[in-house]
Amino acid sequence: MFEHLPPFLNEVVNNSISVDDRDTILIGAIVCLSVCFHNVCGVYDERIVYPNLYLFVVADAGMGKGALTLCRELVAPINRNLHELSKRMEQEYKEAMSAYIKGKKTDEMTMPTEPPMRMLVIPANSSASSFLKILGDNDGIGLLFESEGDTLSQTLKSDYGNYSDVLRKAFHHELVSLSRRKDREYCEVANPRVSVALAGTPEQVRRLIPDAENGLMSRFCFYIIRFKRGIRNVFATSDISQSKNAMFKLLGDKFCHLHEEFVRQGIILFSPLICRNSLLNISVV
């Protein structure tokens, strides 16, 4: 399989140091990048589906699940660009609001609209209302990425942050909504496209999904790193420019440029197989 990877993913997995590391990085990269392909869709079971996936990398302490954290760097430039866009829009909003307050007594001015909070990576410890608000501000697109599964499980157990039902619905791109009577708040996201990447120990999985009856169980892909004895050289390089962090930051910049070109192509639709041994028929709408 690995010899048939697209060039970019091939570059990504070439930075691995072991078989488990390679597998973790590949599946982690696929999940993180899936949230960026919101213009790609297909039909499965007569319903429109998108590439989004939920992943939980499971391993005991010190077994290498930390490799997943490198995959976040692949989408970090896109997330950073969205944050910078939000800051600019917020500054423009404040200036427009200041002008509105000063001139509303004499001129017929329209009150400025508060800008959306643009981001790609959503903090897992967000409240339920904040999570839905951020999704709404970003056209239903978002990535939950946490290197410790407890961050999400503790949030879902709280009164303010229980959005487990939202995650279950978002997996199938169903409409999600929230209403708060106290603040007369209503938020609705019609077509959520959410990806989730988590890492943790088996116990952290049990805290997030206490039993098989929990709907989250069937939504997640679980990659389990088995216990192995051995020691590897953690001082293989002392050159910061050759560190995995630096390598993945460069790959993130590269993907950011690839992504800009990709989204310009419009909606990409995968149609059904025309015969058993044929390739997928791909069309650009």
Regions found by a protein language model. Give the residues of each.
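Phosphate-handling catalytic cores of nucleic-acid transaction enzymes
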Residues: 1-285
